[in-house]
């Protein structure tokens, strides 16, 4: 008997199905087209209405096509047979993608970790205490606003927060929650100078502030504003120079903002599926590929459960308050305001060089969301930070199979030296 569907992802599903099938469709279309002298498909001959605006194969693609053509000629093999084999291979990949998505959506895994005690709450936000009564300086973790906070407490054996608690630290987590009516009007100043600072005020004495991804920028600004409450600062996979490695891609994301305005105005948020679509542009074919690989896993294996746990977190996103979406897309990605010294919170410029407290920068070596150069630019602005290059990716550093070696232990070592 077929198990019932349990989840909706990967989101947005139509986009990922189209991306997954696009290679096969392009191969079929290319095989039917007339050829140009250089061996590339004549898109304009097949569709005259394109009037020269059709895509052309890159020089690297043409070189590979010529290499394959020469190899086929040397082996006296017809190009048509090779094309047919490629199309069959791509169609099998499409079937594997569908199988992987179906296996994910029916997988029995469910997150069962119980939440730790809530010691403060405001609106939809909660402050969770993972080691109440533990000695030493509390470590307050600030996650991104666009994902659930659970990535730092994913599942047994994959929880940075529970690992630190087991090692004698007192980690706390600011769970931003779902933006309600009040939060939909929040801008970044409201989140930082308002809610985050009030969470700090709920704790006795100074804390170590630790921000992950977008949360690192929020933590940085709060630390600059409240050095009386922040003893040290840890920034994990935190961007600073949004134009460091691919300014065109950042500007392209910002250029989408006018088209998103009707949705922002109507809902007061940037919806989850819109956010997921923006992230899909970073690696359009990566998501279909990982679901093809998932189709080959034993559903009862630990690897399968870990895959599902991460995908559940990724697909259970949180909409972004419209004012924050405008600041992030237009100000951060479009204008590169942080790196230019133009990002302001409550009227004051955010400047890492103004911080005198100890700092720790964790820069993933393989990060497509926050390129290493973007995070390194932040380290270069801080006063003598401890820079740790994590041998992992953006999410893997926090909750992957190598997270303990890549981030958890180095962060713990730094905390113990404070």
Label the predicted regions.
Residues 210-219:
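Gly/Ala-rich beta-loop-alpha elbow adjacent to hydrolase catalytic centers
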Residues 357, 371-380:
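Short alpha-helix in the alpha/beta-hydrolase fold that links the catalytic acid
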Residues 185-202:
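Alpha/beta-hydrolase active-site loop
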């Amino acid at each position: 008997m077929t198990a019932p569907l349990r989840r909706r992802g990967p989101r947005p599903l139509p986009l990922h199905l189209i991306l997954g099938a696009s290679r096969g469709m392009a191969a079929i279309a290319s095989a039917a087209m007339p050829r140009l002298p250089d061996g590339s498909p004549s898109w304009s001959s097949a569709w005259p209405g394109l009037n020269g605006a059709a895509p052309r194969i890159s020089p690297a693609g043409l070189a590979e096509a010529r290499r394959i053509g020469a190899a086929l000629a040397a082996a006296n093999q017809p190009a048509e047979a090779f094309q047919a084999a490629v199309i069959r291979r791509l169609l099998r990949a499409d079937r594997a993608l569908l199988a992987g998505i179906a296996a994910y959506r029916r997988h029995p895994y469910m997150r069962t970790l119980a939440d730790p005690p809530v010691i403060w709450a405001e609106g939809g936000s909660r402050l969770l205490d993972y080691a109440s009564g533990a000695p030493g300086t509390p470590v307050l973790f600030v996650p991104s606003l666009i994902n659930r906070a659970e990535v730092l407490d994913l599942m047994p054996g994959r929880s940075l927060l529970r690992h630190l608690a087991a090692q004698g630290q007192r980690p706390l987590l600011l769970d931003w929650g779902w933006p309600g009516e009040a939060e939909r009007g929040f801008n970044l100043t409201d989140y930082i100078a308002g809610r985050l600072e009030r969470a700090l005020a709920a704790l006795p004495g100074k804390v170590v502030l630790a921000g992950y991804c977008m949360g690192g920028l929020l933590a940085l600004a709060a630390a600059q504003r409240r050095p009386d409450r922040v003893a040290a600062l840890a920034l994990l996979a935190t961007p600073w120079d949004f134009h460091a490695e691919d300014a065109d891609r950042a500007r392209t994301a910002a250029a989408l903002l006018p088209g998103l305005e009707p949705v922002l105005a109507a809902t007061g948020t940037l919806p989850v599926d819109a956010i997921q679509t923006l992230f899909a542009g970073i690696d359009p074919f990566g998501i279909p590929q990982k679901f093809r690989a998932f189709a080959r896993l034993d559903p009862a294996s630990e690897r399968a459960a870990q895959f599902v746990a991460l995908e559940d977190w990724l697909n259970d996103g949180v909409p972004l308050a419209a004012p924050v979406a405008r600041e992030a897309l237009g100000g951060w990605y479009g204008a590169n305001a942080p790196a230019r010294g133009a990002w302001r919170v409550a009227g004051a410029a955010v400047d890492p060089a103004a911080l005198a407290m100890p700092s720790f920068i964790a820069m993933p070596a393989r990060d497509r969301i926050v390129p290493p150069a973007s995070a390194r630019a932040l380290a270069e602005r801080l006063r003598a930070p401890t820079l740790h290059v994590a041998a992992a990716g953006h999410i893997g550093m926090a909750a992957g199979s190598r997270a303990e070696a890549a981030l958890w232990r180095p962060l713990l070592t730094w905390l113990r030296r404070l």
